[in-house]
Amino acid sequence: MDNYGSTNFNFSKRRFEHPNGENNNRKFLQISKVAYEYFWRDFDEWENKGFPTLNLSKVELAHFSENVIWVGHSTALLNHKGITVLTDPHFTGRAGPFGFMGPKRITSPPFLIEDLPKIDIILISHNHYDHLDKQTIIHLIKLQPEIKFFVPLGLSDILKSFGVKNIVELDWWQSFKHKNIIIHATQVQHWSRRSFFDRNKTLWSGWMMSWDDFSFYFAGDTGYSNDFAKTAKRCGSPTLAAIPIGAYEPREFMKAAHMNPEEAVKAFQDLNTKYAFGIHWGTFKLTLELMDEPPIRLRECLSEAGVPQRKFKCLVHGEQWGDPFGTCN
């Protein structure tokens, strides 16, 4: 195991670690109880229907510009000043190591991989199967082999095994200049694992992309911490942020790794972002809250915090949102 010279690597534990320590150790009985509840909930026909999708054609996507589209879960498509960015691309039917294993997708993507416009940059937050999907990546690079991937420390090896050649690997708070954009890897409170034997052997991160007149923050997957305030202090406040709002119950089990809507609003405020949209909900049934609860709770929390609904939106799958880009025209 290579520590990559990172100060975020715990030598005694032989793994990466957040400054707040590890919080993802769970006892067998805890896991068994949640698994039991999840198993029976999976038979709920209403929740398996998914959500409405605004389907987009290849022709429509060919003219995609100065806009963001929520594709689903943590996948978003963004364009600014001719640069098109895709986050945590996932277009397959399950989030797992095989096509028959892992949480099933309940809301279909709004378009096919083949319909995507030219992608310049892909941001990967970490190696969990609902964020790093092998079949999606393989399909993408067959169609567009020149895409540049930005990944946290340790993920380049697995991407190379998928056939990816153009990779930039960064530690927390490191940055890379791509054309006229500064791309920062930011610290977030989460963890990594892709098998039984590799817990936290690779890093996880959020991402800040900074143009001269616009910035985009992708939180990836994270619990609430002071990382958002740190990010704003180090990288500046973003124009637009993609903030996770789902997969948070049971709270005692998920709190360290996943924010609930109340915490998502706090993150919005800590970042001092102008706009945000919710991700990590409504696509895969991952945890025990009702599938439609995150956007309902988010709207309530925004009202309580005095944040206008138009500033922090829950987009429909496939919905385009151009308002944040009008601030830089």
PLM segments and residue spans:
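Metallo-beta-lactamase
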Residues: M1-K104, P109-D115, P152-F218, T239-G246, R297-E319, P324-F325, ...
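Histidine-centered active-site/metal-ligand motif
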Residues: H73, H126-H131, H190-S192, F218, ...
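Catalytic core of the metallo-beta-lactamase
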Residues: L77-K81, K177-P238, K255-E263
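Glycine/Thr-rich phosphate-binding loops of Rossmann-like dinucleotide-binding domains
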Residues: A95, L132, R193, R251, ...
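Conserved G/P- and acidic residue-centered "switch" motifs that form tight phosphate/ATP-binding loops
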Residues: D88, H126, D221
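Cap/insert and terminal regions of metallo-dependent hydrolase folds
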Residues: Y4-P19, I113-L116, I121, H128, ...
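Active-site HxH/HxHxD metal-binding segment of metal-dependent hydrolases
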Residues: F91-G99, T107-S175, T186-Q187
